[in-house]
């Protein structure tokens, strides 16, 4: 089976240099090799609130961006949005990808209430180059406030070792896409 990969690099970096923020539901900004999305895909899960995202700095293959939000009402663990930085690249078959070099720094601040979030790489695959997303692979680097994986059973389906890191693997639906997700930090390093 041929598999093609679209990579969404999820990076949250807070810096002091800022450009104009964008706040509408599907607004995006193109910056170098990246597209930054505000992505309020499930904003109706909150009774009210808003979110704004902005690009702070772009230098070569490095990007810094930030997101600010206020959500009230709704379940704290219900995802409201997924701001992200997506790397723009030519689609490739997974078997032709030898490595995906990456480096990420992120920080967050939270003043009150419940803070539930994850920091992750999010990859989408299809069996054809022109196909829609069939599978989503989320690689969680951090989970806060009880954020948990998408799972049909609530239990890991396997333990996967990549290099010297072991991850619990979860599987579940995200609409019509099947998600495979090793959440949180590695079990061992």
UniProtKB/Swiss-Prot annotation:
Family of this protein: Belongs to the glycosyl hydrolase 12 (cellulase H) family.
Compartments where found: Secreted
Signal peptide extent: 1-20
Identification of the protein by name: Inactive glycoside hydrolase XLP1
Gene designation per UniProt: XLP1
This protein's GO CC annotations: extracellular region
Matches recorded under InterPro entries: ConA-like_dom_sf, GH11/12, GH12
GO BP term, example: polysaccharide catabolic process
Keyword Membrane included in the entry's annotation: no
Complex and partners: Interacts with host apoplastic glucanase inhibitor GIP1.
Taxonomic classification: Eukaryota, Sar, Stramenopiles, Oomycota, Peronosporales
């Amino acid at each position: 089976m041929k598999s093609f990969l679209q990579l969404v690099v999820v990076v949250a970096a807070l810096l002091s240099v800022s450009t104009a923020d964008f706040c509408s539901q599907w607004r995006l900004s193109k910056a170098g090799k990246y597209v930054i999305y505000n992505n309020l895909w499930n904003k109706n899960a909150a009774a009210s609130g808003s979110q704004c995202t902005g690009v702070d700095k772009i230098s070569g293959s490095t990007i810094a961006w930030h997101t600010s939000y206020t959500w009230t009402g709704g379940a704290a663990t219900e995802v409201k949005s997924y701001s992200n930085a997506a790397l723009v690249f030519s689609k490739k078959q997974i078997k032709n990808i030898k490595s995906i070099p990456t480096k990420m720094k992120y920080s967050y601040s939270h003043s009150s209430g419940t803070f539930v979030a994850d920091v992750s790489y999010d990859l989408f695959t299809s069996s054809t180059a022109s196909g829609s997303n069939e599978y989503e692979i989320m690689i969680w680097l951090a989970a806060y406030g009880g954020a948990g994986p998408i799972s049909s059973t609530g239990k890991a389906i396997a333990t996967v070792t990549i290099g010297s890191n072991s991850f619990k693997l979860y599987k579940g639906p995200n609409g019509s896409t099947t998600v495979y997700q090793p959440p949180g930090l590695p079990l061992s390093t």
